[in-house]
Amino acid sequence: MLIKDLPADARPREKLLARGPAALSDAELLALLLRTGLPGKNALQMGQELLDNFGGVAGLLHTGAEALKSIKGLGPAKRAEIVAVLELARRALAEELKEKALFTTPQAVRDYLQLQLGSRPHEIFAVLFLDSQHRLIALEELFRGTLTQTSVYPREVVIRALALNAASVVLAHNHPSGAAQPSRADEMLTQTLKTALALVDVRVLDHFVVTASLAVSMAEMGLV
């Protein structure tokens, strides 16, 4: 059934205008974004397919344009629109976390890092620079590519820590493959950076391996 053939109070756009966005289901909100469907599948059904395929709204939040190609009927324009909206949502959530949260627990860091790195298609090494009260000063991406002990320069991390007057740091990198287990190279790099930063009295609190669905704390594994 076409959405235009639904009763007026069941059409997503009319429902939103009459009752507000909170009255709509996740699939209905996505239908408004999609606007049109395919023969035999309306926008509401396509919205539900997106939710089913990617694990709900939380899963969609970590989905990139390439993964959206698996949904029949999503052309380049629609994929770009969805990715843009998801990126705005990630940025809004990241700003809220940055303003409200002290990064004093692994879970607080996990939430922030998954928003920032979880959906990236390429491997990225990043550092959270924290003040003496574990408030975030900055998150900086310092390297892109396969992570090795020689690909990340300790000197660069030390220079940035001093420039930002950081008291401690949290290291992080993503595994686009989805494998969250730290490698031996991850362990060696962590110890190299820990030694370098200790020379300027900056503590390495943790090193996280981030995927779309998981962020693993190396400190909790006794590897920091």
Swiss-Prot record:
Any one Gene Ontology BP term: proteolysis
Residue ranges of the motif JAMM motif: 173-186
Hydrolase in keyword set: yes
Keywords: Hydrolase, Metal-binding, Metalloprotease, Protease, Zinc
Chain residues that bind Zn(2+): H173, H175, D186
Residue stretches making up the MPN domain: 102-224
MF GO annotations: metal ion binding; metallopeptidase activity
SUPFAM superfamilies listed in its UniProt record: JAB1/MPN domain (SSF102712), RuvA domain 2-like (SSF47781)
NCBIfam families the UniProt entry points to: PRK00024.1 (NF000642), radc (TIGR00608)
Family note: Belongs to the UPF0758 family.
Name of the protein: UPF0758 protein Pnap_3339
Organism: Polaromonas naphthalenivorans (strain CJ2)
